[in-house]
């Protein structure tokens, strides 16, 4: 069972995991900026884009069979949970970990900032009614009304959306994250309504060996709203 990949450029392999509700095409606007330095590998996660539904173990095995021996790995939002889990379980393969407006746990807890689970449930309900309209509205909010023409090529399957919702609600890597010794960076947007910027202060205390970057004027999609700053950060981090 193959994972759908798109590859661009040559150089250090950089694998990109998209967020919930989207597919790998969300990365297209930044490919021209990354292509001169990296071999970009876009991945459709299970139930999204052209990748069929499968559980974590099947996804991991099939994906690793298709990837180079070593690679840098970046995950946006839900993709950050996938990226973090892969880095924890396969430290010999993942050389760098970049988490973009993501955290080891998405749902708020007594001592952990996050979002209420209802936020994702409401988003799920809206996606089920009109996916392109919902995603366009979401992007518009995150980019502060900046014009961005996005149309999803292959709508996510209902199973993919439901599985993603389960991941966002249940995956929690706060303890396992302490095992990670590879270079790791977390990027936050000060205006992000989904991964609160105050998460950064708690993470800096709990995981002092990681690097942290705060985009002062960004929300949940700094790679699109502040592409130049994002590319500069990537180039400085991946040596």
Swiss-Prot record:
GO terms for molecular function: pimelyl-[acyl-carrier protein] methyl ester esterase activity. It is found in: Cytoplasm. The active site is at residues 77, 192, 220. Pathway: Cofactor biosynthesis; biotin biosynthesis. Substrate binds at residues 20, 77-78, 138-142, 220. It is an enzyme of class 3 (hydrolase). Keywords: Biotin biosynthesis, Cytoplasm, Hydrolase, Serine esterase. It catalyses: 6-carboxyhexanoyl-[ACP] methyl ester + H2O = 6-carboxyhexanoyl-[ACP] + methanol + H(+). SUPFAM superfamilies: alpha/beta-Hydrolases (SSF53474). Its EC number is 3.1.1.85. Signal peptide: none annotated. Monomer. The physiological role of BioH is to remove the methyl group introduced by BioC when the pimeloyl moiety is complete. It allows to synthesize pimeloyl-ACP via the fatty acid synthetic pathway through the hydrolysis of the ester bonds of pimeloyl-ACP esters. Belongs to the AB hydrolase superfamily. Carboxylesterase BioH family. This is Pimeloyl-[acyl-carrier protein] methyl ester esterase. It comes from Legionella pneumophila (strain Corby). The gene is bioH.
